[in-house]
């Protein structure tokens, strides 16, 4: 039997891909968006800008939620691109694609629960890739100058 584990797959001069750092970059971007969104929601509820938890928000308040979540998506994608060991745009877009899949699942599960306007989860889904591109592009512009 041969020892395939000791055989290099691609030339001996290629650096390791650093899978752990790639995963961490994507997770860190998600965590940033999650924490920023939750903290903002809590503050807006505490200030009575948003109604108490359990009460349906007016549609116009979902516009504001969409705006700050879009900004947070850009920030999260920037963080992902910043931490990515290579190809920052790819990492940000992969993170956005995962977020879009999770957002789609969430939209399907909650569609008929009257939690808010139907356009809201759709807006979050379709802004994922543009947010990723903007966040990663900001990082790329920093590294190229």
Identify the meaning behind each predicted range.
Residues 2-145:
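Juxtamembrane/disordered regions of integral membrane proteins
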